[in-house]
Amino acid sequence: MSRFGLFLCKKHGKYNKLRRSVSKYSLWRRATAVMMVLALTAGLTACSGNGKTDGTQSADEVQLYAWPLGSSSPEDTVTQIYAEKFADEVDRLSDGKMKINVYPNSVLGGDRELLESCKDGDIPFVVQNTAPQVTFMKDTAVFDMPALFDNIDEVREHVDNPKFMKLMQQVYNDAGYELLGYADQGFRVMTTNKKIESLADFKGQKIRTMENSYHMAYWKALGASPTPMTFSEVYIGLQQGTIDAQENPYEVIVSNKLYEQQDYVVETNHLPHLISLIVSDEFMQGLSDEQQQIIREAAETAKQYAREQSDERIASKIKTIEDSGTQIITLSDEVHEQIRKECQPIYESIEKNVSSDIVDAYLTQ
């Protein structure tokens, strides 16, 4: 039996019921982002006469320029809350000697550009969803296994498992980053104009997804027709009937008013929407031990704060949706179990592409 199958069997007490189942990077955009960062910091950097010849900076020195943190997300999101809390904590813990400026809305580049620039140390800090990272770090696909968890607290317990975090930190280190933690925006859910209460109801639904093979495989397994589409086109796509449905966390659904074009929100809870905070490993190694400790401590505080904010905001977003007249559908345990059975080939595919140690650690509480 696959690790995923065994996990689900143990989790749901069904040992006898589950069968064995086993473009080239855009250089000009990156250059533009780097030039923007240099322009933002050059004046202040020039005023600093305390540079170390060994490339490190003493914690006692006053930082005369702010390190940039890039994000592709809008301001009114948990991603921004996570980033700003981290920057505030770094400032507080260093008594104002260490400064970070947050640049949301893809000001410094999209997800791919941010990852490239972070690796090189041009944009030392990045906060982003884990989905775009699969191209750079294939083991992050472990987060793409669908329909495993009943609630977000359970997800957090598995993500925070020390053994799992140690393995994932090595994955990021090998790619040129240091992983500082994972916050989240709860689960991803589906919106549609069709009342969906059974597995058969998903059939034929043309649903917008991210361009991620595992995400698309999930919807195909349910009988839907996944359609990758640029996010900026989703609202008008729903409005014009180009697509029937879409999937996102509650935060995105409300901030972009997608519920205005849909009659139902279906709590598929198929994937947790995890948000990573990463730093360039090269940049981090150039800091003093004290500065590194400040950054790690600030990241832990920011993670916990972002999770608390996420829980509060989701409750508020649900109320906004319900007040608009859009109905929220909670699927039965039976339907969730049927979905898990349909996902067995996806679990098998992920097992083939992700380190078995990482899979085992993620499935262990």
State the predicted function of each range.
Residues 1-66:
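Short, low-complexity disordered leader/linker segments with a strong preference
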Residues 48-153, 163, 172-365:
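N-terminal secretory/targeting leader peptides
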Residues 157:
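Short beta-strand-centered segments that line the small-molecule binding cleft or hinge
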Residues 169:
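Short, flexible, basic/aromatic active-site loop/helix in glycosyltransferases
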